[in-house]
Every structure is written in C-alpha cells, then in structure tokens.
C-alpha cells in the first residue's frame, strides 16, 4: 500500500507542470480566435449586430465574418506592427533625397505595374457566337480591348459602328507638361477603362500613366498625367472620380520599403485635380483600421479597382450609404468599402470568402453585385446579395468552375431586362445571362495580341448603351445617312 501511494504521488508530481501549460494554451488559443474574428470587418459602425448565416443561401463570406465592425482598443492606438493611427502623416521624410538605390528601383518597379494585353490562347471561335434576339437587352456595346489604345462601339451582331484610338506616346508628345518618359511603360498599349459621352467624346485611362479625353474623331482634348488606374465614374456636372496611385515610402506604414498608395482623385471636366483622398488614410482613420494588419508590408498593398459614387438609395437602411460617399473594391484585402470623402474615413466595410474581387456595384433594386475572381474553387463567379441582411440573392458560376474564370479584371452590369452582362476579361469574352443563368448573347474578341499574336486580346469592360443613347455622330450612322 505504501509503495502504491508513493507511486501515485510521484505520478501526480510529474504531471503538475502540465496544468499551467494547458491553461496557457487555452488562453493563447482564445486570444488568437478573438483577434481573427476582429479582423473580419463588416457593416456600418453603429448598426446592430446580426448573426452570420452560414447556410447555402448566405452570400460568400458570411461564414467567415462578423456583422459588428471592429473597435480598435485604446492600447492599439499607438505603434502597432507596420502602422499606427495617431500622428499618421506627421513624419517628415524627403523620399527623393534619402532613398537608397534599392528603394528607387522598387519605386520604378511599382510604377510599372500593369496588366498584360492578353494572356489566354486564341480560341477557335470569335465574334458573336450566341444571340437570342427575343431574350437579350437591345442596345449598342461600348468596350475596350487589350490590342489597341482605343475603344469600339459595336451592335449586337458584332458590326462596328465607331472606333476611337489615341496612343499614350501621341498624347505625351502633344503635352507641354509631359513627365519624363519611362521606357516601354506597361499600360501604354491600351485603354484600361473608358467612358462615352452622348456627343461622342470619350474619357480613357492609361493604367498607371494618364487620363485623357478625346472627341468623336479621336482628337486629343486634354490629358492629365499621373498614376490613374482601373476605374472612373463621371457625374452629371462633368466631375470625374478616378482611382490614382503613388509609389513612395510612407514612413508611418513602412519606413524602409515603398508601397503603392491608392487615392480617390476628384477632377473637374477639364482634367484638373480638385481633391484627393488616400484610401490608406481613410482605412487607418476608421473603425476598420485593424484590417491593415492583414495588408502586405510593402508593394501593391491594396490594388483598389473600383470607384462608384453612391446615390443615397440605401441611406435609410445603411446610413453609410448616403449620397456623396464612394464605394470601392480593394482586391488585396478582399474588401468592399464605403469611403466618406469629407471625413477621409471608411464608414462601411465587408470582407468574405471571395478572392481578389472586382467591380462591386449597387443595383437599382438596392442589392450589391460583385465579380469574384478566384473564390469559386479558384475559378470565378458573379454574386448578388442584400447588403442590409447579407442574404445571397443570385449567383452565376458557369456550368463547371473551369468554364468561367478570369484571374484578373472582369466586370458585371445588371441590364434593364434583369439580365446580367458579364465580362470575362482574361479570356476575351463578354456574355449576357438570364436570371436563370442561361447565356443568350456571347461575344469572343476577334483581336489578338502577343509577339506572335498567340493570345486573345483581353476585354476590360463592356457597357450596353440604352437604345435611346444618341449615336448620330457615329461613322456607321453618318454612312447610312448618305
């Protein structure tokens, strides 16, 4: 008995050290889980929490998110990781005089970031391959393509009504305020995004280089140089909201390595900058600042790709969606956000299981639609959900995941007949689908690119113009009038 008792006491003494270790593991695990939950930010600050629905009917991302915006603890409001909120921009730093050769080289690399004109092999078919007249939305198609610095106006059968073309070097040469010309700048071979005015004028973005305006005959009206990229939105009074960026060192984010800092720039109708808001500042100054811990330490930290002015139709349900605030999509954080331009602050944000998303947009019915580039088992999908209750409304995935994929770019537009116009940029395709997911119109870009024309030219966006859109200035209309 004595020996047994001594053996039991020995075992107990040997195991005592395990108890504090197990307790410590539990505490660390709980803290890590709580921190992870905090970093998935959603909804408008001040709204009531809603239980995240993880059922099949919930939008992508609900299962990994909380509906309560993260509150930044007071102890985090000093330096934390790579960033801090207090004194965000007060560090003085002359990045032109104090940069090392390595830093200067990295800044030049970041400035040259851009998209390829094409990356997928040329398919066997091209042009309009599907056209169900009775079920498509009538109108002309205005689109930009990777093989030429220009845009095309085309009818539903693929007949070209008008073309615009104006090269970057041509615009650069004509401008007295031109910057130093970088060798073979990416983005100079095509218009990344374009906007068509009713008189035939076009606004166009050379990705990372410039924004310009040409008339219906492609004559240059004005050009503004800068890091303009991805997207623009034009107001009724001619004011332009456009994404821009700057490659530089932001000491309060990373004092050693350059970043690409994204901005929302506001231009007047002549291309003169009126204001700009840093998306980095807007996020750092907000309830969602903790998301910066998920950002890369340097380089293209955000890759913001969408800018859309809100019209206030959802303000009564989500105050952050008031008219004048701006909706953006931040690819590198898988984030949809609303920016208050006056307060320089993100006032609403949503992350989810979507991957590298593009073109979040508010629909006429108050829902939100998003091009999810890589969230469908590595393939793409378009999703529509209610931003108020986060319930899934509609998805398009194609018949099989490989059938629909665009790792980069992509766009989606809801049409008046309730069909959806989708652009699969990488594969140079655009198609119109019914609410049931049936393709009733498909266009495959006949243009090719690459040194040996081995790639189909990307289609960056297609806009279906309403039938009432005036086009009497187009070459086809003028030819028919003769």
Where are the regions that the model predicts?
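N-terminal Sec-pathway targeting helices
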Residues: 7-24
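N-terminal intrinsically disordered, acidic low-complexity segments at the extreme N-terminus
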Residues: 1-4
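Histidine-/acidic-rich catalytic cores in large beta-rich domains
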Residues: 20, 29-482
């Amino acid at each position: 008995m004595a020996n047994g008792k001594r053996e039991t006491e020995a075992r107990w003494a040997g195991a005592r050290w395990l108890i504090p270790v197990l307790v410590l593991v539990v505490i660390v695990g709980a803290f890590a889980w709580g921190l992870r939950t905090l970093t998935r930010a959603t909804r408008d600050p001040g709204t009531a929490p809603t239980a995240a629905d993880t059922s099949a009917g919930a939008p992508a991302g609900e299962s990994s998110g909380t509906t309560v915006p993260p509150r930044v603890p007071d102890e985090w409001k000093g330096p934390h990781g790579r960033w801090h909120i207090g004194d965000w921009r007060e560090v003085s730093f002359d990045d032109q005089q104090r940069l090392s050769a390595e830093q200067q080289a990295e800044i030049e690399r970041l400035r040259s970031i851009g998209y390829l004109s094409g990356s997928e092999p040329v398919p066997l078919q091209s042009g309009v391959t599907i056209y169900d007249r009775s079920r498509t939305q009538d109108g002309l198609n205005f689109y930009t393509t990777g093989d030429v610095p220009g845009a095309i106006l085309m009818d539903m059968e693929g007949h070209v009504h008008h073309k615009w073309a104006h090269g970057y070097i041509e615009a650069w040469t004509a401008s007295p305020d031109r910057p130093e010309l970088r060798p073979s700048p990416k983005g100079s071979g095509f218009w990344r995004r374009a906007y068509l005015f009713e008189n035939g004028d076009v606004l166009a973005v050379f990705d990372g280089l410039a924004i310009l305006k040409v008339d219906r005959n492609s004559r240059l009206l004005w050009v503004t140089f800068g890091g303009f990229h991805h997207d623009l939105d034009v107001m009724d009074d001619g004011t332009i909201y456009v994404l821009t960026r700057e490659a530089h060192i932001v000491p309060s984010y990373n004092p050693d390595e350059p970043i690409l800092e994204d901005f929302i720039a506001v231009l007047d109708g002549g291309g003169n900058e009126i204001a700009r808001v840093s998306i980095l500042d807007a996020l750092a100054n907000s309830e969602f600042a903790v998301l910066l811990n998920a950002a890369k330490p340097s380089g293209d930290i955000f890759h913001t790709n969408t800018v859309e002015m809100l019209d206030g139709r959802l303000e009564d349900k989500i105050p952050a969606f008031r008219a004048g605030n701006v909706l953006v999509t931040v690819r590198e954080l898988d984030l949809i956000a609303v920016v208050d331009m006056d307060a320089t602050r993100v006032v609403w944000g949503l992350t989810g299981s979507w991957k590298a998303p593009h073109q979040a947009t508010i629909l006429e019915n108050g829902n939100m639609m998003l091009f999810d580039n890589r969230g469908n088992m590595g393939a793409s999908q378009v999703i529509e959900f209610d931003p108020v209750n986060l319930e899934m409304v509609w998805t398009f995935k194609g018949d099989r995941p490989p059938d629909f994929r665009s790792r980069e770019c992509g766009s989606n537009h809801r049409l008046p007949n309730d069909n959806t116009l989708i652009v699969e940029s990488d594969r140079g395709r655009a198609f119109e689908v019914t609410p049931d997911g049936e393709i009733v119109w498909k266009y495959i870009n006949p243009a090719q690119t690459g040194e040996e024309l081995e790639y189909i030219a990307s289609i960056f966006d297609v806009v279906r113009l309403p039938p009432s859109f005036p086009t009497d200035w187009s070459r086809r209309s003028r030819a028919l009038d003769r």
